[in-house]
Amino acid sequence: MSESAIADFVSSFIPDTATHVEPVRGRVVMSKRRIVLAADDEKTTIPLNGVFDVQHETAPGDLARFFEDTVTIAYEHDEDRHVAVIEGGGSTVDRFVTLVFKALVHGTTVYAKHPARRGGRITDQPFEKGNLALSPGDLTITGDADTTIDLSTVSHFERVDREVNGSNKQLLSVRHMGSTGPITTELALSSGRKMNLLGRYIRLQYTHLKQELADVTLTSEEIEALVAIYSSGPNASLAAVLGVDASRVTMLLNDLIEKELVTDDDGIALTSLGRAAVSEHIEDVNL
């Protein structure tokens, strides 16, 4: 591959589910234009402009005997559809998946209505043109529609039909947290393929955090503390907001830090899991 590699690691993979029944061991090399799966006696090239779906999940039943987790890449090449499966565990693969999505949708033109709703109220905000940019945990829209969606705070998303600049379009409606509470942003892309990929990326972030959050038990007092930190920032007077003394606040914060919902490295701040918890519970709290 002549272009520079942005990912290069060794893994087990099934180069093509139509022709291989068992995984092989080899290198996974990615550039800005393609992914190459290279084993001892063969090489499979996946053109990124042909990729129409990417999934990162627990291995389905027929692959569970080979893999615990998988990255499945579906793509078109020479007018045929193919599916490649890569072993999906570990931080290296997590970074690889993010790089794949960045290569697929980064810089794509988007029309965004932000916010389309504040809480349950529809706004009169117009659709504005921008470009997509992905960074760890964030979806940023640059240009006229200048905004950033913290993906850890997404509580719901769906495809809906809306009129955009005089024509009916299918778009993504994303409910997430804004600076003052829940808002909804609507995103329209001209490419159905890229719309599907963006939706898949949002779902991936959403699902992984929800799975982590399902293992965390929170008391009503802990939820109130998380919402107070979100609403007031590192200078929040939790003792005053919660009506408890300083020693109780210290105990609460220690519990939240242990549950990886809060960090105190540079002042009190929510982790991505903590922000997801706020998004899940904020409407249950009246501060």
From Swiss-Prot:
The keyword GTP-binding does not apply. Keywords: Chemotaxis. InterPro entries: CheF1/F2, WH-like_DNA-bd_sf, WH_DNA-bd_sf. GO terms for biological process: chemotaxis. Pfam families: CheF-arch (PF04283). Disruption phenotype: Deletion has only minimal effects. Involved in taxis signal transduction. Interacts with chemotaxis (Che) proteins as well as flagella accessory (Fla) proteins. This is Taxis protein CheF2. The gene is cheF2.
